[in-house]
Amino acid sequence: MNVQRAKEISESAEQANVSFQGMPVMIQHVDENSETARIYDAANPERELTVPVKSLEER
């Protein structure tokens, strides 16, 4: 995924089908400078991670 699309998803009210290593996730925030995203596991919102945006996949 690219940074612009990740930002669109994070700012949208709609829920997108995004995954990280096969795990459904929600994007909280995108840092354009570092090209990373703060995500959390859709099934376990307390599990937060910061990952490279390019590692996210939209299904």
Swiss-Prot record:
GO terms for biological process: asexual sporulation; sporulation resulting in formation of a cellular spore. Induction: Expressed only in the forespore compartment of sporulating cells. It is found in: Spore core. InterPro entries: SASP_SspH. The keyword Lipid biosynthesis does not apply. This is Small, acid-soluble spore protein H 2. It holds the Pfam family SspH. Keywords: Sporulation. The keyword Repeat does not apply. It comes from Bacillus cytotoxicus (strain DSM 22905 / CIP 110041 / 391-98 / NVH 391-98). It comes from the Bacteria. Belongs to the SspH family. One of its GO terms (cellular component) is endospore-forming forespore.
